[in-house]
């Protein structure tokens, strides 16, 4: 005899007050991930996933839209305070931080965590246009 189908349990959303926003701004794209203090991802968004393709992905406006999408999705967890870690040299650094501030979060600190080589790999050759 077949077992009766188990009822799917409703997933209870945990409430998180403090979180960390990781903004990775490269020359081609911007990735915004909002995590709790332990590093568990609550929400994320990218410029490419927000509907921008090609060279429009690397604009400050695309980074702003991605940060707004990630910020609105993380509001469901009851997030209030954010520490912001910014990594990379891309054009969407400041606009992503401003967009998170506009979502209603209290930003406690902004930290630049861009990795800087101590004369590591050879950089790419310069563009000739």
UniProtKB/Swiss-Prot annotation:
Key word ATP-binding present: no
Gene3D superfamilies listed in its UniProt record: Ribosomal protein S11 (3.30.420.80)
Single Gene Ontology MF annotation: structural constituent of ribosome
Matches recorded under InterPro entries: Ribosomal_uS11, Ribosomal_uS11_bac-type, Ribosomal_uS11_CS, Ribosomal_uS11_sf
Top-level taxon of the source organism: Bacteria
Matches recorded under PANTHER family: 40S RIBOSOMAL PROTEIN S14/30S RIBOSOMAL PROTEIN S11
Assembly notes: Part of the 30S ribosomal subunit. Interacts with proteins S7 and S18. Binds to IF-3.
The family this protein is said to belong to: Belongs to the universal ribosomal protein uS11 family.
Protein's name in the database: Small ribosomal subunit protein uS11
């Amino acid at each position: 005899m077949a077992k009766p189908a188990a009822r799917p349990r409703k997933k209870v959303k945990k409430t998180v007050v403090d979180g960390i926003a990781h903004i990775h701004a490269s020359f081609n794209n911007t990735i915004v991930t909002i995590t709790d203090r332990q590093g568990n991802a609550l929400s994320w968004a990218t410029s490419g996933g927000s509907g921008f393709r090609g060279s429009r992905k690397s604009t400050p406006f695309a980074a702003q839209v991605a940060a707004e999408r990630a910020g609105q999705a993380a509001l469901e967890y009851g997030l209030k305070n954010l520490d912001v870690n910014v990594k990379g040299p891309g054009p969407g650094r400041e606009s992503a931080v401003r967009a998170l501030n506009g979502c209603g979060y209290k930003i406690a600190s902004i930290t630049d965590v861009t990795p800087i080589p101590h004369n590591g790999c050879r950089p790419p050759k310069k563009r000739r246009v």
